[in-house]
Amino acid sequence: MTRALVLSGGGPVGIAWEAGLLAGLAEAGVELGEADFILGTSAGSFVGSQLAMGRRPADMAAAILAEAERVSAAVAAGSRPNGGERPPNLAGLFALMQEARSGERDPKEVRKEIGKFALEAKTMDEESFIKSFGRQLSGPQAEGWPERGYACTAVDAETGEFMLWTAESKVGLARAVASSCSVPGVYPPITINGRRYIDGGMRSGSNADLATGHELVVVVGLRTAGDAATSERMRAPLEKEMEVLRAGGARTELILPDDASVEAFGLNLMDGRRRPAACKAGMAQGRALAAELRRVWN
């Protein structure tokens, strides 16, 4: 049986929750990182790249949990974590993303509009952004590509064209992942082969429909607090992507954050102070899901 794992976007907080979820599952003997194919979008591209390179979920989670000590130290010293900066307000961006995903307007044209906004925004420079990923995306491995099946997504900032980075793309892993994580207005578009690329989540939060051709596809999605109508509107595109997978003969399993995880996220997935709590919640959810998921994955 061929197995695929799809990891969705969700900012720094989403990275923490996904790492915790995977660690909790692995602790109970369910190794989603052993998938034949891993597809990552935005936050999921980073987590997926680590899995594809053989990094243990437990190690990812441990590094995130250690951040709690730094946050506590900053508060005790009377300073604010994250350099005193408030997490960015992305309400306008999210509204455009919803337009692109809902079909209200031509998705490619909306993505071009988002790309224009990203290209004009004042952000850190590209190299500083890539370096911010730390040693996990540095050195020789960052210039190559995982031997295991791995792909991540991006969008051309000028044309709105969607891009799927794979081993055949002949692109360095660090730049591919950075482009997938380039949240418009927050991080810089990334230059690859003379083009500028932004977050693959501008097409879809998960791009799960691209994982066709596998018998079992586990999709790890994200959701945040909101009323029922908002939640349904955000989930509808994902359900359509799952239908594409099932129409291709795949069995699908969808994992979404439980209520405890959503509470741990807070209101802004870009708020790095929430990462340790999100990771802990993910670990607890992973442990709780393990018995059920083991029956289909193992």
Regions found by a protein language model. Name each.
Residues M1-T41, F46-N298:
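Patatin-like phospholipase
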